[in-house]
C-alpha cells in the first residue's frame, strides 16, 4: 500500500504518530487499519478504485460505501450519513451492540432512568460485601461498560470511571450503581455522536476538574475531565482521577488544562499528517479564572503563585509560539462538567443540548444549515 504509484503501488504514506493510519497526498484519501478491518475516507471514484485493488489482491470478505440509508460498520461502530434540510450529517453509534449487551446481562426489561448517577450516594448506599459470583459479574460488566464509554458514550465516562475505582472491593452499592448505568443506557440507545459534513474543520477543546469533590472514592485526589470536538463531534474524551493531590482548586484546574493541551497536541499531529489543516492557536475552553490566568501569564508573581510545576514552562512555550489560547466559558455551558461530577437529569440534558448546539452552529457557519 505504501509502494509509490510509479512502481505500481497505491502511493500511501504511513503515519508517524499513528502507524495504523495511511494518507495519499495526491488523492487526499485516508485509510485506517486495525488488523483486517479497514476504513477508507475519500471521494467515490478513488474509494471504489482502492477497494477493487485490495479485493483483487487479498479477496475481501465484503466492502461497503457509506451512503444515505446504508450505514457501515467498523470495529462495532455504526457510521451513518443522513440528509437534514439539505445538510449531510455524519453520526457514529454503538446502539446495536449496546442493546445486545443489555440482553446478555439479563436486563432486557429493566426500567430506564434519566441519569446514570444523579448523586454520589448510591455507590455508597449499601456497604455489604458481595459474593465471589457477584464480584466476577461486576468486573466483567464494568469492563464492557468501559469499552462503550471509551468508544462512543462520553455521557457515561465519569460514572464508569467512578465504579471502576471500586473493583478491588465492590459492595452491594456498587452493584446498584452499575445496574443504574445500564438502566440509563437502556433509555438512551438512540444516543449518537454527530457532526455536519463541511469543507472546513472547527476544533473545540474543553477541560475541567473537580477539586477533591469525591473523597469517599478518590480520597483527596481531584478528577480531570477533557472533551475534544471536531466539527462539533466528540473525537476524544476522558474522565480520570489525578495522580497527585492538588492543594487548591486552581492547581487542579491547571493540571486539567495542561492535560487537555497534551491531548490536543497529539491529535493535531495526527491531523496534520493526514492532510487536515489545523488552525492555531488551539482554543481551550475552561470555566476557571485561575486556569485562564495561568495560560495568559505564567509568572510566579501572579495571583496563582505557588501552584506551578514543570507545566509552567511548557505552557509558556506553547503560549509564546501561539499554539494555545485559553477561553473563559460559562460554567452552565461547560460540557465537560459531565466528565467530572455527578449530574442531575436536568443539568445533563442542558449540557447535551449545548453539545449539539456547537455542531448546529458549525453547520450554519459553513453551510447555512439548521
Q: Which ranges hold each PLM region?
A:
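C-terminal reverse transcriptase regions that engage the nucleic-acid substrate
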Residues: 69-190, 330, 340
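RNase H-like nuclease fold core
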Residues: 145, 205-252
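RNase H-like nuclease module associated with reverse transcription
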Residues: 166, 202, 243-370
Amino acid at each position: 500500500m505504501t509502494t509509490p504509484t510509479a512502481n505500481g503501488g497505491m502511493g500511501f504514506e504511513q503515519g508517524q504518530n499513528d502507524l495504523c493510519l495511511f494518507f495519499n497526498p495526491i488523492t487526499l484519501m485516508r485509510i485506517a487499519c486495525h488488523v483486517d478491518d479497514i476504513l477508507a475516507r475519500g471521494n467515490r471514484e478513488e474509494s471504489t478504485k482502492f477497494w477493487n485493488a485490495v479485493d483483487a489482491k487479498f479477496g475481501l470478505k465484503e466492502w461497503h460505501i457509506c451512503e444515505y440509508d446504508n450505514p457501515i460498520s467498523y470495529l462495532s461502530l455504526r457510521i451513518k450519513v443522513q440528509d437534514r434540510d439539505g445538510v449531510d450529517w455524519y453520526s457514529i453509534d454503538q446502539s446495536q451492540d449496546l442493546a445486545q449487551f443489555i440482553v446478555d446481562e439479563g436486563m432486557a426489561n429493566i426500567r430506564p432512568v434519566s441519569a446514570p448517577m444523579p448523586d454520589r450516594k448510591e455507590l455508597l448506599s449499601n456497604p455489604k460485601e458481595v459474593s465471589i459470583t457477584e464480584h466476577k459479574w461486576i468486573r466483567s460488566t464494568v469492563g464492557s461498560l468501559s469499552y462503550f464509554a471509551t468508544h462512543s458514550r462520553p455521557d457515561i465516562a465519569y460514572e464508569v470511571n467512578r465504579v471502576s475505582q471500586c473493583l478491588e472491593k465492590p459492595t452491594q452499592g456498587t452493584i446498584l450503581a452499575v445496574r443504574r448505568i445500564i438502566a440509563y443506557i437502556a433509555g438512551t440507545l438512540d444516543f449518537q455522536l454527530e457532526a455536519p459534513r463541511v469543507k472546513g474543520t472547527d476544533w473545540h477543546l474543553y477541560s475541567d476538574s473537580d477539586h477533591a469533590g469525591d473523597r469517599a472514592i478518590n480520597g483527596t485526589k481531584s478528577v480531570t475531565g477533557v472533551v475534544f470536538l471536531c466539527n462539533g463531534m466528540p473525537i476524544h474524551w476522558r474522565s480520570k482521577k489525578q495522580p497527585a493531590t492538588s492543594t487548591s482548586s486552581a492547581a487542579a484546574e491547571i493540571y486539567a488544562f495542561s492535560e487537555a493541551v497534551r491531548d490536543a497536541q497529539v491529535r493535531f499531529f495526527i491531523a496534520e499528517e493526514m492532510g487536515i489543516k489545523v488552525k492555531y492557536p488551539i482554543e481551550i475552553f475552561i470555566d476557571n479564572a485561575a486556569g485562564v490566568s495561568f495560560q495568559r501569564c505564567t509568572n510566579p508573581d501572579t495571583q496563582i503563585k505557588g501552584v506551578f510545576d514543570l507545566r509552567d514552562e511548557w505552557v509558556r512555550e506553547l503560549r509564546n509560539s501561539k499554539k494555545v489560547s485559553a477561553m473563559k466559558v460559562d460554567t452552565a455551558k461547560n460540557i465537560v462538567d459531565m466528565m467530572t461530577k455527578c449530574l442531575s437529569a436536568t443539568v445533563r440534558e442542558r449540557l447535551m443540548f449545548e453539545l449539539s448546539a456547537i455542531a448546529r452552529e458549525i453547520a450554519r457557519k459553513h453551510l447555512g444549515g439548521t
